[in-house]
Design a protein with these regions (language model features):
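Short beta-strand edge/turn micro-motifs at domain boundaries
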Residues: 141-190
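C-terminal tail/extension regions appended to the core domain(s) of diverse proteins
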Residues: 9-10, 135-139, 173
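Surface-exposed, charged secondary-structure patches
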Residues: 107-156
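Short solvent-exposed beta->alpha transition segments
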Residues: 76-124
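A mature extracytoplasmic/lumenal domain signature
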Residues: 63, 98-100, 148-154
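C-terminal motif of bacterial Sec signal peptides marking the signal peptidase cleavage site
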Residues: 5-7
């Protein structure tokens, strides 16, 4: 959320995750090992669980920006791009909710965000009752998966939503070097 900071709440959430990661890796060597190791420790998994919750909150904050036609269109499109990057892939689906009642449908994240950009009127979203339903556990693909549940205020859809969370290795470039590091992503929102 460097480009689209949402104030003290996001800064506090980032600080909590940074502190949890710092406790898990007090030295530079340990920090490097934390992100490149083949398995994660309990403390590291706890830190990534906190980061997953932050990413979900960030997604909801992005939705409020995207759904505000009073904001600059380019700014809203950048917010949509950043929101999409929180997911495992652009093909992730979202149970589309809006400010109006009706049966929500499953749509791709990109279609959902584009519909919000086209929406008439301002919508404001916030998370209520965020819970960890399934803590992060190692799967057969050498990734960690878990599940969060939450309710969203600002919508007519009062159902409990669920999203999968995955912590997987991704290739990142650090100057001239590349390395595989752990990163957390959201999956489909149902």
């Amino acid at each position: 959320m460097a480009l689209l900071g949402t104030g003290c709440a996001t800064a506090y959430r980032d600080s909590a995750a940074d502190e949890a990661l710092a406790e898990a890796a007090p030295t530079e060597a340990a920090l490097s090992h934390q992100f490149t190791s083949n398995r994660l420790s309990k403390a590291q998994l706890d830190a990534f669980q906190i980061r997953a919750q932050q990413k979900l909150r960030d997604f909801i904050d992005y939705l409020t920006i995207i759904a505000n036609p009073a904001l600059d269109s380019a700014f809203r499109h950048i917010a949509a791009q950043q929101a999409e990057q929180l997911f495992t892939s652009p093909q992730a689906v979202v149970r589309a909710w809006s400010g109006s009642p009706g049966e929500p449908e499953l749509v791709s994240i990109s279609s959902f965000l584009e519909a919000l950009i086209q929406q008439e009127g301002v919508l404001t979203f916030s998370i209520e009752q965020l819970a960890v339903d399934q803590p992060l556990v190692l799967n057969d693909s050498a990734q960690y998966e878990g599940e969060l549940s939450f309710n969203v205020s600002g919508t007519a859809d009062r159902a409990t939503h669920r999203t999968g969370v995955v912590v997987k290795k991704v290739t990142k470039k650090f100057g001239q070097e590349t390395d595989s590091v752990w990163e957390v992503f959201l999956k489909d929102i149902q």
